[in-house]
A protein has these predicted regions:
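Aromatic- and acidic-residue-enriched carbohydrate-binding clefts of CAZyme catalytic domains
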Residues: 23-77, 92-131, 159-180, 184
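Active-site groove signature of glycoside hydrolases
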Residues: 87-88, 107, 114, 118, ...
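Conserved, mostly hydrophobic/aromatic
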Residues: 7, 82, 133, 151, ...
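Active-site beta-loop-alpha junctions enriched in small/polar residues
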Residues: 20-24, 87-91, 154-156, 206-208
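Catalytic domains of carbohydrate-active enzymes, especially glycoside hydrolases
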Residues: 2-22
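Catalytic-core regions of glycoside hydrolase
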Residues: 154, 158, 165-220
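Short, well-ordered coil/turn segments that N-cap beta-strands
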Residues: 11-13, 76-80, 145-149, 195-200, ...
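Generic structural signal for well-ordered alpha-helices
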Residues: 4, 68-72, 86, 133-141, ...
């Protein structure tokens, strides 16, 4: 809450919360509790490997939905809008630890990563991925009163899509010239999900390299 007070002091009226990344998942999703209950911790017996810090002890944490409602209310009194970011389609290594089915269909080279699977991006060719993300984004949209939900779009390792036979077949079928167009398709599907729940997308600028998204997209 101290950070929110500092934002108010400096008349900054937006707080973007980066709630997911390769390293952790920090928001409770009731339809998929494993995301935070497992993905919010690392070390010890956790399947999430620590990048820094303790290896022998389990540590971490996440925001419950009640926690987040308290933060949103505290910020609103100070005229600050809280915008959540669910970073997609890349930066999903943590989520893939619990849901490996989201990944592209090829055998990763683990020898360069000490046995650790470094695939970190959703496979845009898998229809089931959009069903999973619909579950997640529905709860995010219901929880946050903001008009905008940030859906990421940055730093996607597209070499994974180039190696994926499903992605390549999907691109050929749909006349896509490159993987940036495949990312545009993925982000457009998420935009449709958000629109269904009355929200607009915010993205990083890399998300529009494959072409224009919806007119109401906020680009950072």
């Amino acid at each position: 809450m101290d950070y929110i007070d500092l934002l108010a002091l400096h008349k900054i009226n937006n707080l973007r919360l980066h709630l997911t990344d390769d390293e952790a998942w920090r928001l409770e999703i009731k339809s998929h509790p494993e995301l935070a209950e497992v993905g919010g911790f690392r070390g010890g017996d956790s399947p999430i490997w620590p990048r820094y810090g303790k290896w022998n002890e389990r540590w971490g944490g996440y925001y419950t939905q009640d926690d987040m409602r308290e933060i949103i209310a505290y910020a609103a009194v100070r005229n600050i809008e809280v915008i959540p970011e669910i970073d997609l389609p890349g930066h999903s290594l943590c989520m893939a630890t619990m849901h490996p089915e989201i990944l592209c269909n090829y055998e990763p080279n683990k020898s360069r990563a000490f046995g650790y699977d470094t695939r970190s991006a959703f496979c845009p060719a898998k229809e089931a991925n959009y069903e999973l993300l619909d579950d997640i984004l529905k709860e995010v949209c219901e929880l946050f009163p903001t008009s905008y939900i940030h859906i990421g779009g940055d730093e996607v390792d597209m070499s994974q899509w180039r190696r994926c036979p499903d992605c390549q077949a999907f691109m050929r079928k749909n006349g896509m010239a490159n993987e940036s167009e495949l990312q545009r398709y993925f982000m457009s599907r998420l935009t449709e999900i958000l629109a269904k729940y009355g929200k607009q997308p915010a993205v990083w600028n890399e998300a529009i390299e494959g072409g224009k998204l919806a007119n109401d997209t906020r680009v950072y």
